[in-house]
Amino acid sequence: MLISISLATLPILAFSWASFIEPNWLRTTAIPWRLPKKHAHLHGLRIAQISDLHFHKRVPEKFLNKVSKSIKNFSPDLIVFCGDLLCRARLEDKERLETFLNTLEAPLGVFAILGNHDYSSYISRNTKGEITCIPEEKSRPIQRAIIAVMQGLFSSPSYRYDPNLTPQEPHPDLLKLLKNTPLTLLHNTTHVIPNTLNIVGLGDLFARQFHPEQAFKNYDPSLPGLLLSHNPDGITRLQQYPGDFVLSGHSHGPQVTLSWPKFARKFFERLSGLENPYLARGYFVTKEGKQLYVNRGLGGLKRIRFCSPPEICYITCSYD
């Protein structure tokens, strides 16, 4: 009898944890960035990476304060945001969002790129599995989620675009808001910090705005390169370009996952919708030597997380 009651309460406890505890359980990850000795002057440079805020009215103020306090305590030289400030291309409660963004300060600057939620339309997969604009009235999130599960298990993970999808423009109201904050938007461009490093910001893959041939025009090959690509699949399209460390988000970990057993982890990775599902979270090094860190992000379409708490990544440079 007691065993039956215990088993019956497990789903309730798991749902409560995933809905109310873990989405607010902010974690930090420390990553070293080892540079050649010729860049020894960058030893100790500190970078904070955040991603996927998906800001909306229901994001708790207490959580935003946690993020701000953690970053302030780390005292970074540089802050980067890897896309998806907005949720479904909606700018809600913009005064509160602006207030939060104005808490992000760093001596070398705060830089941001756009994600698939940050353009004039929300871009994701439709019920046919094609990447396209998703009108709010036709969002059908439950139906699309079920179809995504089926496609993730039985279909090729390669991206299929709606043939009518044209390159999307950045969200105009978001651009206006960013001008009132410390954030510098990098959209297919490179910002060179003299005698320090290149920061390359790519447009989003889903938005058909990923243009590295344009982004690297101003790149200084004598300096290390930090590359910002919202979608981690971007790294497969960057191998012929310079740069040492790629920072991404997009997949959220995924938000609900299991790290064990292995087949369960593989199952949830497929549900991330990536072309390369193994890139759903964590640190990687390509055979060409590029490093990649995929951040689990801060938020999501729904504030539900299980075995994938929200994250800030702290990177410290050193030399070999």
UniProtKB/Swiss-Prot annotation:
Topological category with respect to the lipid bilayer: Single-pass membrane protein
First-tier enzyme category under EC: hydrolase
Residues that coordinate or bind a divalent metal cation 2: 84, 116, 250
Cofactor: record remark: Binds 2 divalent metal cations.
Gene Ontology CC annotation, any one: plasma membrane
Metabolic or biological pathway: Glycolipid biosynthesis; lipid IV(A) biosynthesis
Keywords: Cell inner membrane, Cell membrane, Hydrolase, Manganese, Membrane, Metal-binding, Transmembrane, Transmembrane helix
Keyword flag Aminoacyl-tRNA synthetase: no
Highest taxon, organism lineage: Bacteria
Residue intervals passing through the bilayer: 1-21
EC number(s) on file: 3.6.1.-
Pfam family, one: Metallophos
Similarity remark: Belongs to the metallophosphoesterase superfamily.
Protein's UniProt name: UDP-2,3-diacylglucosamine pyrophosphatase LpxG
